[in-house]
Amino acid sequence: MIYLDNSATTQPCEACVRVMTELLTDCWGNPSSVHAHGIAAHHRLRQAREQVASALGAEPDRVFFTSGGTEADNWAIFSAAERLGKRGHHIVTTAVEHHAVLHPMQKLEAKGFEVTYLQPDREGNITVDALKKALRPDTILVSVMMVNNETGAVNDIAAVARMLKVENLSLIHISEPTRPY
């Protein structure tokens, strides 16, 4: 069989499976517990957090793990709206986002936020110009996926980030469980 749906689910590499098997077999304690299994799990979790932080050039206390992409998207979007809601109530996203982004946007609309949904161009991309035109003084968040999980269209996130920096909008959310690294 030729499997072509890696944007939905990708088989993990053998090294990942080996480490996960080891952790699930030998290090299954609750990392918040004070017994031996919990302490071991806490140590491994701290190591993982430090490795990810180092790879990102971030501080370990700024790295958070979630159960998956949907939880991460929800957390990021709702947190941004809560934190920045006093500054404005406008959010820009795309009409072709994953439901993990679209559903939180709909919930925020029900709470009084205004969401602009950008349509992709003929190639399936969101242009920087279209995004710039959608910005307003009360825009608090831009949420754009890097790679569309259904079409494979790749947005130029670096160009989007540069434009947002020039426009002095400091918060961008990128839903990115699809792109291979």
Region spans (language model):
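Short, small-residue-enriched loops and turns at beta-alpha junctions
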Residues: 10-11, 39-42, 99, 122-125, ...
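Single conserved hydrophobic/aromatic residue that forms the stacking wall/gate
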Residues: 172-181
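Short amphipathic alpha-helix with an adjacent loop that forms part of the alpha/beta core around
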Residues: 128-137
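Active-site core of PLP-dependent enzymes with the aminotransferase class I/II
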Residues: 126-128, 146-169
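Conserved N-terminal alpha-helix of the aminotransferase class I/II PLP-enzyme fold
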Residues: 32-71, 75
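N-terminal "arm"/small-domain region of PLP-dependent enzymes with the aminotransferase-like
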Residues: 1-33
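Conserved PLP-anchoring active-site segment centered on the Schiff-base-forming lysine
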Residues: 80-102, 114-119
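Buried hydrophobic positions in well-ordered alpha/beta secondary-structure cores of metabolic enzymes
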Residues: 5-6, 20, 52, 69, ...
